[in-house]
């Protein structure tokens, strides 16, 4: 072998060795894409690990916060255990962000207003879409997924988006973000799927055709669910519910048919029975701090106890996660705002510390603390007559455990023997603090009665946990 050839081969083997030792390439965010679990009930990461969706509603993040403010908000949500941020790409048409950059040319969403370069210090380079790029990447660095709403329902309903424009716009979005692993597409936007149906179908179909690896869902109007229109559509990976913001006695509109009131678990239970099997989630229950019923600011406001109730009710009924929202945060209420919606009287910088925001992580941590993909809702566990509304007990179980949630702290009885073993370990889990207190072992036969800590009242909520010994 001549000396020259030896040097070439040595260099080649050296290069191959280095490449072999290098870690597998990841996306710029270092995050794994999400996919459905094998049983189609839950989400998981690409390597098969459970993913419990704990969302926060940051609808106007893109067009109301600058780069520094976005970092403050996203970092706070990361620290509080959230892993999904729900964001509108286009809230209105036309649309511009805090830097004054327009999203589109004129009012045509099929013509995104883009410029060469993306230097943030150069206003001629840093366009609307560069700002969204930054938000997506920043979220990814913090381990957060972005559930992006391409265009909100109101401008579509008003006729500002044609089916052809929707198709072109969706293709632009799909091709721009299909290599970002921390994206979830949230078609729709507080609207019935039957309203402008062709627009929503074109968006869903085009996203799927050009971006086959990201999950797609549909955000419906209040007191409805995506399954009413799109359950059988190939582009819809999982269902989404907006249980809404009304009290029981406020849910009387003749335009609605379900009238579940505050019983958001009923939407989840209905989706759970559908075929083909698809995961489901309540992605917009009542927001903490918003007036009950939304529009009359003299009404009482929903509290942290209420958002806990919606969370545990829906998850124990079979949902794969839960989305929290706070009135001032969802609209990013700033001191510069000339007006606010729904009686928001607090700046977002303060409202991010609402009590419920810190409590939601306890739900996620609880569900991830036991076997995950085998969990099912099971109301046959509840042996005493099912009470209605706030007194209802929601129960769920896995292979080796049972959980039952009470919002009022009332006594209740469970049918034993649903998991293996002669005895079970019994504990009370506090949704306010995330603390678990073991209180004994009990026989795993017959019916057993349980008395939660404290007095019976709304908001004295507890989770009973029974584990196989």
Predicted ranges, named:
Residues 1-9:
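Bacterial N-terminal signal peptides that target proteins for export
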Residues 19-20:
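C-terminal motif of bacterial Sec signal peptides marking the signal peptidase cleavage site
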Residues 28-250, 254-263:
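Active-site mouth of glycoside hydrolases
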Residues 186-188, 217-220, 240, 281-284, ...:
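Short beta-strand segments
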């Amino acid at each position: 072998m001549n000396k020259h050839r030896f040097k070439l081969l040595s260099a080649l083997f050296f290069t191959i060795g280095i490449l072999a030792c290098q870690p597998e390439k990841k996306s710029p965010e270092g995050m794994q894409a999400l996919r459905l679990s094998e049983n189609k009930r839950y989400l998981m990461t690409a390597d098969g690990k459970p993913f419990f969706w704990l969302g926060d509603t940051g609808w106007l993040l893109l067009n109301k916060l600058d780069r520094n403010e976005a970092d403050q908000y996203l970092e706070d949500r990361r620290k509080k255990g959230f892993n999904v941020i729900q964001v509108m790409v286009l809230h209105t048409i036309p649309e511009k962000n805090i830097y004054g950059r327009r999203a589109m040319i004129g009012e045509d969403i099929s013509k995104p207003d883009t410029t060469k370069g993306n230097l943030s210090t150069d206003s001629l380079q840093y366009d609307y879409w560069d700002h969204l790029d930054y938000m997506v990447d920043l979220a990814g660095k913090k381990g957060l997924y972005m559930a992006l709403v391409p265009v909100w329902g109101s401008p579509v309903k008003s006729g500002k988006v044609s089916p052809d424009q929707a198709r072109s716009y969706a293709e632009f979005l799909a091709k721009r973000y299909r290599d970002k692993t921390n994206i979830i597409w949230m078609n729709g936007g507080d609207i019935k799927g039957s309203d402008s149906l062709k627009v929503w179908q074109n968006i869903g179909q085009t996203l799927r055709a050009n971006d086959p690896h990201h999950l797609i869902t549909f955000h419906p109007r209040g007191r409805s669910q995506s399954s009413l229109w799109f359950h059988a559509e190939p582009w819809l990976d999982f269902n989404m519910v907006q249980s809404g913001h009304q009290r029981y006695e406020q849910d009387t509109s003749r335009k609605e048919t379900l009238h579940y009131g505050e019983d958001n678990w009923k939407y989840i239970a209905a989706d759970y029975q559908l075929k083909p099997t698809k995961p489901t989630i309540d992605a917009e229950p009542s927001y903490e701090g918003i007036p009950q019923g939304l529009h009359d600011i003299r009404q009482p406001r929903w509290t942290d106890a209420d958002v806990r109730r919606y969370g545990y009710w829906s998850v124990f009924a079979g949902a794969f996660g839960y989305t929290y929202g706070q009135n001032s945060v969802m609209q990013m209420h700033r001191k510069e705002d000339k007006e606010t919606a729904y009686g928001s009287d607090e700046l977002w910088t303060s409202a991010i510390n609402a009590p419920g925001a810190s409590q939601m992580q306890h739900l996620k941590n609880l569900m991830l603390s036991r076997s995950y993909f085998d969990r099912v809702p099971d109301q046959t566990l509840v042996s005493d007559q099912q009470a209605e509304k706030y007194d209802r007990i929601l129960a769920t179980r896995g292979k080796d455990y049972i959980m039952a949630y009470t919002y009022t702290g009332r006594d209740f009885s469970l049918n034993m023997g649903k998991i293996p073993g002669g005895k079970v370990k019994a504990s009370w889990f506090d949704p306010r603090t995330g603390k678990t207190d073991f209180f004994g072992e009990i026989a795993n036969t017959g019916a057993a009665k349980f008395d939660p800590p404290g007095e019976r009242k709304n908001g004295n909520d507890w989770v009973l946990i029974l584990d196989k010994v």
